[in-house]
Amino acid sequence: MEGNRVYLAACPDYGQAEAKLREAVAALGGMERFVRPGERILLKANLLRAAPPESAICTHPAVAAAAAKLVAAGGTAVITDSPGGALHKEAVLRGLYEKTGMAQAAAASGAELCYDASTRTVSLPAGRVLKQAEVIAPVAEADGVFDLPKLKTHVLMSMTGAVKNLFGVLPGLSKVGYH
């Protein structure tokens, strides 16, 4: 892990999310280090279920809006997730985005909301167990993915974070087999 850097800052309330994220990105070399002009960047939120922001179950919309504003300086931000249920459909995603505040975050930041429920098989040549996997198509087609996890406890884990949130790139119920 040599050369990897982590930035940690106290953020006592979500009203400071954008300022703190800007501070972090600047400390890591600026957004131009991560986004090239014209790129389409997926903001992979943790949208476990249709729960309001105050429930602290999903990525907070202030964090998604802040990330989208930073991406928008050079590219296009697209908010997405693939909930764990069998109904990964546009109508379900629409309700999920409304209830979690992601629709408002997109409106406030200029981000797009992704309703594409199609899948793609991607090659994993360095994989030790899997050499390919099915993922949601927007992930395979994006120029980059910014992971916006929600730090919380989990029934199968002590806590969840960035790696666990990436289970959301697997379509619908296929996540179950990977747990």
Language-model segments: residues:
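N-terminal and secondary-structure boundary signal
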Residues: 1-179
